[in-house]
Every structure is written in structure tokens, then in C-alpha cells.
Amino acid sequence: METKTVILMLSGGRDSFLAACRLLDDKNQYKIKMVTYDNGCSYGSENVSKVAKRIIEKYGFERASYLGVYRIGGIIREFFSPYFNMKPDEQVKRYKGMTPSQFHCLVCRTGMYICSIWLAMSEHASYIAEGGRKDQKFVVELPGMALERYSALVKEADLELLLPVYELNDNWERDNELLRRGYICKTMEQKCLIGFPAKDSIDQTVIDGVHAYYDEVILPRIRELHFLESDTVLCYLENKYDEFSK
């Protein structure tokens, strides 16, 4: 059977952990290449390699590998304008109820998808996957973004999006499924300082605002910068910053 290679976004948490397991146990015999992203506001990104190691030890290097931590600050900053320079009344007029926390998640997750597309091109993968769940109170994980916009973005790059745990709505069952696979449910998830889920159910105006910003600002900027073209990979795919010596 042909090996189907997947770029999997691995945060180190239990959702992306289980996503890796489900892909590897799938009848399609996926081969996964795990990657972690650091947006510049995260702690503990380097610890995620310990989670990847647990997966590799069980399934073997032929099926699973870890590409490391990639810095995506240079992608995310492209999407800050015009939001950061808008007055509150302007923000509400143009982008309805989009909160700062949902804005942060929007630009960050989009940056992850772009870098995943670059990695897929570089690693000759056909799929991109993540551990997003629709019940986690982030607009980027609701159907309008995950199933529609991000799926379309990935498809535009001639790739396919896989969401192995998207319909899972019970942490108890998630942990039990990991236990049945022989894993203790302790992980080393990185901590984002600006990622903040909605306190209650997500208001439709928040969803509409996130969709509007993506449609009107982010997607046109992605195309303007040719981020989905294969030549871009040669220029921008880097997993560290240079450092000045003393």
C-alpha cells in the first residue's frame, strides 16, 4: 500500500497526541511528520519533543518522525494590520464582535497552516492534520474556519486537511482512548500566553468578525505574498532565528 505522508501540528497536548495515534492506527497507513509552532508568546515549545518521542517509540521511525519547532512570528505579523491600529469603534464597525483573544488565535492558527503547507511541499506530504476540536470555544476550530476556510486554504495548495479528533466532545473518552493505547495521559503541552478561549458559548457576532477579518484581510494578504506557491518554501522555511554573538 502507498504510504500517505501527513504533516501533523503537535502542540504536545492530549488532543494532538490522540490525533497522531488515530492517524497511525488508521487503515490508510498514514506516515506522520510532527511539527510544533512557536508564535513568540509561548513557553515550553521545546518540551513537545518528549511527547513526539513517546509516539515514535511505539510506532517506529518508519511511521512517525518529528521535524522540530518552527518559529512563525514572521508570518503572523503580516496579519496584524489594520487591526492593531484601529480604534475600538472602528473594530466593531468592520469586524463586529471579534475579541482580541479570538484575533490572536486567528492570526496564529493561520500562521501554523501556512508553515504546514510549506513543510508539506518540502517533505512531499499530501495531507495536513491538527488536533482541533469543535467544542473548544475557539472560533478557529468551529466549522466556518476549520471545515470551510482552512480546508479551502489547504486545498488551494493541492493538499488535503485531516481532522482526526474534530468530532470528539468528551475529555474523559479522549483520555480513555489514550489509556487503551498504553499511554499515561500526561503530556508536555506548550503554553501560549495570549491564547484564551471564550468564557461561555461563542456569540455569533464574534464568529462573524473572525470570518470577516480572514476573508477581507488575511486571505488576500496570503495571496499577495504568494504564500501558497512552491517557490516560497525555498525562501521562508526556517526553524530558528539568527543570533548576534557578543
What residue spans do the PLM features occupy?
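Nucleotide-activated chemistry modules centered on ATP-dependent adenylation/adenylyltransferase
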Residues: 1-246
